Design a protein with these regions (language model features):
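Membrane-interface alpha helices of multi-pass inner-membrane proteins
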Residues: 154, 200-217, 250-255
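Short hydrophobic alpha-helices at membrane interfaces in multi-pass membrane enzymes
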Residues: 144, 149-152, 187-210, 244-245
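Membrane-lumen/periplasm interface segments of specific transmembrane helices
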Residues: 242-291, 301-317, 321, 354-356
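Hydrophobic/aromatic-rich transmembrane helices and adjacent perimembrane loops
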Residues: 177, 221, 363-403
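Transmembrane signal-anchor helices characteristic of membrane glycosylation enzymes that use polyprenol
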Residues: 1-55, 252-264
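Transmembrane-helix motifs of polytopic, lipid-linked glycan transferases
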Residues: 101-141, 183
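Signature aromatic-anchored transmembrane alpha helix within multi-pass, membrane-resident enzymes
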Residues: 2-5, 149, 251, 341, ...
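Specific aromatic-rich, kink-prone transmembrane helix
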Residues: 116, 160, 175-195, 204, ...
Length: 581
């Protein structure tokens, strides 16, 4: 497992080195974690790239200002815990803005998630032994081996998933939401296996609910279904005191989180995302479309496009096995078989289905980037698929071994029964199954890591970044749209590299190059400018109007004007203009 984790970390560092740009939400993560003076648009005025950069980094003397971070999030629609973590890392590296600060936070979350998912898989596999009053040492050892095998297979498929790698590359809170989802799941599975809930369980539960809620509000959706399933289990077992203690602990932890962060109520019930989510959930007409959309994402970015084959294979083996069981029952040779749908599996299935459906109904539809909303349960879904396939295949092997034993007894009645059982034991088949599992994991990893399925890397930004670094001293004119002036902040990582920047609204009157404010700037006499222009109708005509210059394609006959489109990105077009005076 350690070797597997190290290999996956190496893969993550490889993709981290390829990350060349940022999603606008990632830039907001840095800004809302490290704000200094705030971002303001002063129309038709010069500013410096340093003033933008100061909003992305922690300046010396401004480290560990968690109160500012909390206040910034209260003005947005998210809880603050993830931003505390990012601010901490940036505080330890003051004055630096780097993708590795955010990736390192997510990488730590990935490692913790890996360990928790492995533990969840192990607990799911060994649960049946807890149902036996006095299991033998050999039985315990067999179930432990099963647990290790299941944990290794699940973590390998999960950690090499394109969606999971993308989640680490995306500098937002979803990887840490996965941490608390899996931590909460492990607490409940452990309680099922041990069949008791002590004070340590309730203490860890309270901490998990508190921190999970302060990481992302989707945590409540997960815990609602997990808690409902666990309460049904407590009711079935008639553990009345445990039920009261469980509900009380969850309510107290949630109440403490709301007392600490009261803005959460307005975010959920009055914020634009909360009201949008409620509206989408109430709209029954889009249910099938949304479920198909998110199922397709899981299939493509986690299962390599083979989800249908997995499900078909599980169903075929299960149906065949059921047929053989019925035939054995009619002939009086039915053998006792291990249950597949154990309480842990039922809890996993109920929770994953509830979360998947609710999030599919309420989350934003943003193409492949919408994977982040279902990311916290991708490990659970992989666990359910691998466990189901393993168990139905194991039942088939068990049935075949028993049938072979009966045939051997009839053919060789003089042979000792133990010798016949040893000859027909499924040991070799288990080795074949293990090799097949390794082959499947390698195939799934290859399918996930090829075809440019890992996103949030923005490799096309590499050329733009080179252009920016070559022109750091060139004055920049940002022509923004007043209706969407916040789109300026989508360019923060680039604008922070330039020395002088002039902001001007596209709808403004008068030529920019001859305006008093422009001429008073230190860069007014430059013979070259970089133009960032927001997308708009008649963009070329608007550009000429604002600069008071007609630009022919390429250069004019006298060579006095050079006009070139450098790149298009995020609703912006970058131009390079030389000798415009």
């Amino acid at each position: 497992m350690v070797l597997l984790l190290c290999l996956q970390i190496i893969v993550l560092f490889y993709y981290g080195s390829r990350k060349a740009g940022f999603h606008e939400d990632e830039l907001y993560s840095y800004y809302s974690s490290n704000k200094t003076a705030g971002l303001f648009v002063n129309d038709r005025e010069w500013t410096t790239g340093e003033s933008f950069r100061n909003e992305l980094v922690v300046l010396p003397g401004e480290q560990f200002r968690y109160g500012v971070v909390k206040q910034m999030q209260s003005w947005d629609v998210h809880p603050p815990l993830y931003y505390y973590l990012l601010h901490t890392v940036c505080s330890l590296t003051p004055g630096i803005f780097s993708k590795w600060q955010g990736i390192s936070v997510n990488l730590a979350g990935f490692v913790i998630s890996f360990i928790l998912l492995a533990y969840a898989a192990y607990l799911t596999a060994v649960y049946p032994i807890s149902m036996q009053p006095e299991p033998s040492d050999s039985q315990k050892q067999a179930y432990r081996k099963r647990g290790y095998a299941l944990a290794g297979t699940v973590c390998a498929m999960w950690g090499f998933g394109a969606a999971v790698i993308s989640g680490v590359m995306f500098i937002r809170m979803y990887q840490w939401l996965t941490v608390f989802v899996l931590l909460c799941l492990c607490l409940h599975l452990r309680a099922l296996v041990r069949k008791r809930e002590n004070w340590k369980f309730y203490l860890l539960l309270a901490v998990t609910v508190f921190l999970g809620f302060l990481t992302q509000y989707y945590y409540i959706i997960f815990h609602f279904f997990l808690g409902a399933g666990f309460c049904l289990y407590l009711l079935k077992e008639k553990k009345w005191k445990s039920l009261v203690a469980y509900v009380g602990t969850c309510a107290a932890a949630l109440g403490a989180a709301l007392v600490y962060y009261p803005s959460a109520l307005s975010h959920i019930f009055k914020g634009y995302r909360g009201t949008e989510a409620v509206g989408e959930f109430a709209n029954a007409s889009n249910t099938l479309e949304r479920i198909q959309f998110f199922t397709g994402l899981f299939d493509k970015y986690m299962m390599g496009g083979f989800l249908a084959i997995w499900l078909l294979l599980i169903c075929l083996i299960a149906v065949t096995n059921r047929f053989l069981q019925k035939r054995a029952k009619r002939s009086g040779r039915e053998q006792k078989r291990e249950r597949i749908l154990t309480p842990p599996v039922g809890l996993l299935l109920f929770t994953a289905a509830g979360y998947f459906f609710t999030v599919a109904k309420t989350a934003l539809l943003l193409g492949e980037t919408s994977n982040r909303y279902e990311l916290p349960i991708y490990g659970v879904l992989v666990l359910l698929l691998v466990y189901s396939l393993y168990m139905v295949q194991k039942e088939m092997e068990q049935g075949n071994a028993q049938a072979a034993e009966r045939i051997a007894l009839m053919a060789s009645p003089n042979l000792p029964k133990e010798e016949i059982r040893k000859q027909n034991a499924p040991g070799k088949k288990q080795k074949i199954t293990g090799k097949a599992a390794v082959l499947v994991v390698v195939l799934m990893a290859a399918l996930n890591l090829t075809g440019n399925k890992v996103f949030f890397l923005y490799p096309e930004e590499a050329g733009v970044q080179e252009f920016v670094h070559r022109n750091e001293t060139t004055p920049v004119i940002v022509l923004y749209n007043e209706a969407s002036e916040t789109h300026i902040w989508w360019l923060l990582d680039e604008l922070s590299e330039y020395e002088n920047i002039y902001l001007a609204s596209i709808s403004g009157e008068g030529e920019i190059l001859t305006s008093e404010n422009f001429l008073n700037g230190n860069a007014a006499e430059s013979q070259k400018y970089i133009i960032y222009m927001a997308d708009c109708e008649n963009q070329g005509e608007e550009l000429q109007r604002l600069l008071g210059t007609e630009f022919p394609d390429g250069s004019d006959a006298s060579g006095e004007i050079s006009y070139e489109e450098v790149a298009r990105k995020n609703m912006w077009t970058i131009y390079e203009i030389c000798s415009v005076k």
